[in-house]
Amino acid sequence: MIFPFAVRLDGGGRMLDGAQGVYARSLARTLAERLSRPPRLQARVAQLTADGPLDGDDGAEGHGFIVASKAWTLEEACHVDLPEGTEYLLHGSAELTDRVRIRILLVDSPQKHLALDHVVLRPRQELFAALDEAAAEVAHALGEEPRREPWPTRDVEAYVAYLRGRDLSAAHEMGVAVPEPRRSFDPYLEAVRRDPDFADAQERLLALALSLAARGHAGAEAARSACCSLLALQPRAFKACLALAEIELLERNPRAAEERISRALAIEPGWAPAFERMGTSLLRQRRFGEAVGWFERALRGRKDDPAALQGLGTALAECGRVEEAMGCWRAALVSGVATADLHENLARGHLLLGHRSDARRHRTISRRIRGTPRFGLDLLRNAWQWLSNGPGAGR
């Protein structure tokens, strides 16, 4: 269990440099990820939050991440409650200015002794070597040999910007009130500006964009702007086109989504996940015949793609090919999908085929998943179907 590293505070109890809190959390997170590579090691990061501003007075109504003001003593560390199965606690202090300084304190919690006390001190431009050294020292203290994993970029300043972005992403994931969410993308954009091939920075920007877009129109506008900025920096970032398509679908604009997906496929024609999204955009435009071909193309790449199976089923049903549609929906059910919408589709399909008892069964399951009670017209419809077929009718 790795806790955010301590940073120095001024006489008023505030960090001497607010960025140091970001780097303390980020370096701890990075170290945990590097230590989780060997087969027998698995590190987890503890998240610390507290009431108060995240960044100045603008965030006073929200919650902010905190880091400790000093490294814990051995006695304090041994009294920290750890999750079951966790044997070691890693803590210390960190500083990232024109140099990297990390003090690592590795505590064997069951034995209540210090397994490692090591200081890493290197110039800022040797950040990657400093983190590799820290991970190696911890692994050796645990009797393991660390793997040498490549870094996602060799540009230190791009990586430092990326760390700031990771910290903001973590804040959004934990529900921390972040001032000016639109600016949460700036660190990732800086990382890509410094290293246009920094793929992980692009991926995390897009993940954050989709997360914010799902929260409402304001988030969608910020996400759309960030994706467009990424495309301006890296015109071949086809996944940014696909993220923009998702935003258009969320905003109920399938025609614009189709255009975005077409642009992505012009850059990367063989990207199979785009086939299903193209089918979905056509489906929402009620262009069912065209959608069938795209869903079938998606399933040639992955036969058990649940989204493609459900989409193909809907398109086929709208084209009057109900038996084939039922086959797709059943395959989606077998693949593990158990949504109310899928059971509702199965109920409608069974009803069209005259299988009324099966239709009632799936409608009941759909209602149970949605938490919808049986009353009024539902009871009347079921009673009428039962009377129409007789008490012994099965199909």
Predicted regions and their residues:
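Structural marker of alpha-solenoid helical repeat scaffolds
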Residues: 194, 233, 267, 301, ...
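Catalytic-center loop of serine/cysteine hydrolases
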Residues: 24-30, 34-174, 179-181
